[in-house]
A protein has these predicted regions:
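Expand to "…catalyze enediolate/carbanion chemistry for C-C bond making/breaking, isomerization
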Residues: 1-189
Length: 189
């Protein structure tokens, strides 16, 4: 995380950084990792305030602990929150309400921008409704989990050289892009 901040310092504010609490936290050290994220977000190293955080899966007990630690600890300097492993727009709306409630409790008046990872067929089926949510600013395609969710129907090569050429992958990316353009959001992968 420090290397990314250093690179951003050298290159300027030309890219965002996402601190990963889901895959970045060592097992058993999830709270310590979230605390480190807060420390870095509030440090002078966060020059441009273009650092967001990817929290744990909403079904994980660490989702709530991430929110409970990071929003009060560094919410004013947080560029966005990325929510992974969602299944539908109603779930995303409920998670946003939970985030907003914690922000209000923490004295944060701004609405934190939300990035949503589209990683499953369920979320892809509801991608237009997810994109329509006002606080959602970006939909990001989670290629690895999406391919894994097909249990071999998409070959493992779709995670390497051919990652964007398989028809199911192209279809998913197209749906995400169309939903984003329809509602003025940013598509990413």
């Amino acid at each position: 995380m420090r290397k990314a901040l250093q690179l951003q310092k050298e290159l300027g504010p030309c890219f965002d950084i996402t601190f990963d609490c889901e895959d970045g936290a060592p097992v058993g050290q999830e709270l310590a990792h979230a605390q480190l994220v807060c420390e870095l977000l509030t440090s002078p190293e966060n020059l441009y305030q273009q650092v967001g955080v990817r929290v744990h899966d909403p079904l994980s007990p660490f989702f709530d602990s991430d929110i409970d630690c990071i929003i009060p600890g560094a919410g004013q300097r947080l560029a966005y929150i990325t929510i992974p492993k969602v299944s539908h727009a109603i779930q995303v709306s409920q998670l946003i309400q939970k985030i907003n409630h914690k922000a209000t409790q923490s004295g944060i008046s701004k609405r934190l921008p939300i990035h949503v990872l589209i990683e499953t067929n369920e979320s892809l089926a509801d991608v237009f409704a997810i994109a329509a949510l006002p606080q959602v600013v970006c939909l990001s395609f989670g290629l690895m989990d999406f391919v894994s969710g097909y249990y071999g129907a998409i070959p493992s090569s779709a995670m390497h050289v051919d990652q964007f050429s398989h028809p199911l992958t192209r279809r998913a990316m197209t749906e995400i892009a169309v939903a984003c353009h329809t509602f003025g959001k940013t598509p990413a992968h």
